[in-house]
Amino acid sequence: DIAGAERLSIQAESIAPESACTSMQLHLQVSPADFPGNWNAAQVLAGPQLALGANSPYFFGHELWAETRIELFAQATDTRTDELKAQGVRPRVWFGERWISSVFDLFEENVRYFPTLLPEISDEDPLAELAAGGIPRLSELRLHNGTVYRWNRPVYDVANGRPHLRVENRVLPAGPTVVDMVANAAFYYGLLRTISEEDQPLWTKMSFAAAQDNFIGAAQHGMAARLYWPGLGEVTPDELVLRHLLPMADEGLRRWRVAPEVRDRYLGVIEGRAKTGQNGSAWQVATVHALQEQGLDRPAALTEMLRRYCELMHSNAPVHTWDIGR
């Protein structure tokens, strides 16, 4: 049951509708000491990230949220009864509920709140493995963690015999073009570097609930959302990006040693999107509305919109430059 510009209420016998949720996932390998700062920063950024990158306004022919994928994924995998919801049982698709001071906070929440779906037990004794100088694979922890669908998820893994932690950012949809997706990644990684290294971190100046409200508001309204930001109050995404976040993203990419011309190219895409207010979702909605005003019914308008989308996608021109009237 998703209510946006229109409302869609359907019942499914499986999680098959979730297969419509195509995402872009960004990973950052960090040290244990740096993990909480980077995860908290990623949570702060989820709202602005999604407002800029929304690209999923239609589902089953209905105009719903700017990024319908967020609510569709949440509802399609939610098996809680009303009674369990009233008791405070957490959904497995989860934003979280607090800032963290250690990666253990998240793994402890996994155990505390979410029952095991796949009770497979490995033969490994992690403590014995450590005592012998080996690297434990922690198969049970990794399997269980993979059944908790946080929008920013902790990842423990072993690669080439070395253990590491990653922040897995699952906020963004795929598309519309490769250049848009690279720009989204540059914006995210630049801001993550700057915000996570601040002496007075942003997450100490705002409630966790405000970050979650930003995330849901951005999913619902995209570039028309109102986002809370410390020191600014409620602002529109374009104002937040153009006046505050773009310089921070540029500085973060500089710290990552990204060349100035590369920073300019991809952050220029973000700037153009913020100035025009046209992300993938806005273009799709405006195009369908224009086609319907020309006399097409909704199915025909969606079909024609998709044809144009595919054509423009292969051009690799950023979505903020796409023409609506063509």
Question: Predicted regions: what is each one?
Answer:
Residues 7-18, 30-326:
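C-terminal accessory/tail domains of diverse enzymes
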Residues 1-5:
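N-terminal low-complexity, intrinsically disordered segments
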